[in-house]
Amino acid sequence: MNSDSPIIEIRNLSRRYGKLDAVNGLSLSVRPGKCYGFFGRNGAGKTTTIKCLLNLLRPDSGEVRMFGLDPRRDEVAVKARLSYVPDLVAFYPWMSVQDTLAYLASFRKNWNTGIEADLLARFHLDPKQKASHLSKGQRTQLALIGAICPEPELLVLDEPTSGLDPIVRREFIETVIGAYQSSDPGRRTVFVSTHLISEFEGLIDEFTIIDQGRNLLTMEADAARDQFRKIRVRFAEVPAGLDLSAALKVKQNGREMEILANGNSEELLAQITSHSPEELRCEALSLEEIFVASDLLPKAAA
């Protein structure tokens, strides 16, 4: 595997549960050193996709490659190079925080004790506290420490901030993930499935939005912000001849309008300007706003 090869590659992945298509013909590719967002509503197929990546579920069809390897055939080699934090985490209840981390470290070739000490202090976790006495948020914190200390090439995170309070969430996202990637930016890759999109806004390089197991939109984050625009306009009187049929969505409140554009903001701005508005602003959408707007995009045929 060379330095430009995808860390994750999914081609036409499908997985059914009875008659339900949890994942249906999904394809995506994650490049090294990127923070890749995997977005979708609850039940869209995100966790099923991740489980297929990690050989926790067997796909019905399609191909999955991690580091250029088949995670079914080369499971040990693949998992030695990554860390995974699921939405729900559990530990042996009789072990302390310290014992749990020592147990996790015993399976790893590398373990950074400096990172361990730093994160225990940041999260205010007592090393002697039993796992059975940890809250859901504290268990998530412990899982995150266990995932980052081996300094893996890939972090796979499924709703990693679930159960964390807002202050700890922000510190984890901005400091912990940021520091993980910045220590070796060309090599450290993050694949994060989350519904708290706004909190990862500054870290996401590229993303895929899935809907009913299908790829709805894949873009680089900066390109998406350029493509999806919000136009705010106020007229003295809304002109009868204003044609906004090319807009993704139009919301009107009296003399004011909010218009969503998908790659055609210049065309819409020209149309609006020709009617001499009192006020006109055009701004990029956030990733969360793009996620909401993606529901207006055409869906793939079943």
Where do the language-model regions lie?
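Catalytic Walker B motif of ABC-type/P-loop ATPase nucleotide-binding domains
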Residues: 155-159, 164
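ABC transporter nucleotide-binding domain
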Residues: 171-267
